[in-house]
Amino acid sequence: MSSDSSREENVYLAKLAEQAERYEEMVEFMEKVAKTVETEELTVEERNLLSVAYKNVIGARRASWRIISSIEQKEDSRGNSDHVSIIKDYRGKIETELSKICDGILNLLEAHLIPAASLAESKVFYLKMKGDYHRYLAEFKTGAERKEAAESTLVAYKSAQDIALADLAPTHPIRLGLALNFSVFYYEILNSSDRACSLAKQAFDEAISELDTLGEESYKDSTLIMQLLRDNLTLWTSDLNDEAGDDIKEAPKEVQKVDEQAQPPPSQ
């Protein structure tokens, strides 16, 4: 079997796995595809399949971690130390899984995808992805490990931003998605609501001013991300009044291939 037909088969198997909601296998198939980029860069479809596969695998664990952390806080506030001890061990198991998933995609990005990227759009996509998965590590790591993950996130997002501002239109869904996640990083990880709001507002305003230039093919994705930027601005500017009232929303599944938006740590 030629490498071309093998790559084509793995892409098809990844699509089957997605339909069957077998996302761990979808990751495996797309990892095989990603390791062939030395001969030919991933297509937009392949890139999106890889992103969706990892997004679902990591998303399930992030949701589990938030639920368990919330229960841990409640048990701790009630003084149930025996339960807290059990929960900490269980949370540790989830964190091990999260670390393994993040390390997997980060290694793939560093060794194969980023070096092989030639187009500005691809570079921004992969650097944004690198920032995203370092951010997911920063969500649950503590101490020096959290600091390191946060610094790596900032470097990746800034590198992506430099290219996006120079080469992608303000309405481009990948540029908008980067602004969305970069602003979430400032808000959640660095606790800098001013920087978060400033970044989100600038991205939204710049996109609005060029909305009439938006092509039909990306209109839905771009306007949906713009709506999420606006929703977050509304939430963040009112959070002092009701800090635990609302969650920062996840992007709907239909634009997962473009972007994903983080949620805050569990409310007290």
Curated annotation (Swiss-Prot):
- For whether the record's keyword set contains Nucleus, the answer is yes
Q: Cross-referenced Gene3D superfamilies, in alphabetical order?
A: 14-3-3 domain
Q: In what ranges is there compositional bias, type Basic and acidic residues?
A: 246-260
As stated in the Swiss-Prot or TrEMBL entry, residues carrying the post-translational modification Phosphoserine are: 69, 192, 267
Query: Keyword set for this entry?
Result: Cytoplasm, Nucleus, Phosphoprotein
Asked whether the UniProt record includes Nucleus among its keywords, one would answer yes
Mind listing the GO molecular function terms for this protein?
Answer: ATP binding
Q: One GO CC annotation, please?
A: cytosol
Where is the protein localized?
Answer: Cytoplasm; Nucleus
- Coiled-coil annotation reads none
Output the superkingdom of the source species: Eukaryota
Q: Which InterPro entries match?
A: 14-3-3 (IPR000308), 14-3-3_CS (IPR023409), 14-3-3_dom_sf (IPR036815), 14-3-3_domain (IPR023410)
Task: List every stretch annotated Disordered.
Answer: 243-268
What does the annotation say about its assembly with partners?
A: Interacts with EDE1. Interacts with DREB1A and DREB1B in the nucleus. Interacts with CINV1.
Describe the function of this protein: Is associated with a DNA binding complex that binds to the G box, a well-characterized cis-acting DNA regulatory element found in plant genes. May be involved in cell cycle regulation by binding to soluble EDE1 and sequestering it in an inactive form during the early stages of mitosis.
**Which PANTHER family does the annotation name?**
14-3-3 PROTEIN
Family indicated by similarity? Belongs to the 14-3-3 family.
Name of the protein in question: 14-3-3-like protein GF14 upsilon
Q: What is the lineage of its organism?
A: Eukaryota, Viridiplantae, Streptophyta, Embryophyta, Tracheophyta
Instruction: Tell me the name of the encoding gene.
Output: GRF5
